[in-house]
Amino acid sequence: MIAPADLHYSRDHEWVRLQGDIATIGITDHAQEELGDVVFVELPDLGDIDKGSPIGAVESGRGDSDIYAPIAGEIIEINTDLVVDPAKINIDPYDTGWIFKMRVSNPDQVNDLMDAASYSGLVS
């Protein structure tokens, strides 16, 4: 399982890459390994979202898994490439497999998330 050190992680297996007040969010390598081959991604709608709210889902041969907002803010972009090729989540969950981008309401929210070492300990 890969957990890049520059990201923040939720207990629901989402990752957050914060650059200024913009966060890119996806599901972790561990999550995609547990799900198996991703066949469909329900992408979130643009707009404001609260921390912890369900915003979409990932479907695989092993079942469905909800995606939750690990932080609050405004969803400003979705990865529409996943509609055509949801397997990007399996191939590269931290780059081409990102799910959405948001303008965070408070960048300090990431301090409530785990670092890579803590997340690796959670899933080991």
Question: What do the PLM-derived regions correspond to, one by one?
Answer:
Residues 1-57, 64, 87, 91-124:
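Acidic, low-complexity mobile loops and tails
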Residues 13, 47, 69-77:
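Generic structural motif
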Residues 60, 80:
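Short, conserved catalytic or interaction motifs in soluble domains
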Residues 77-79, 106:
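Poly-acidic low-complexity segments
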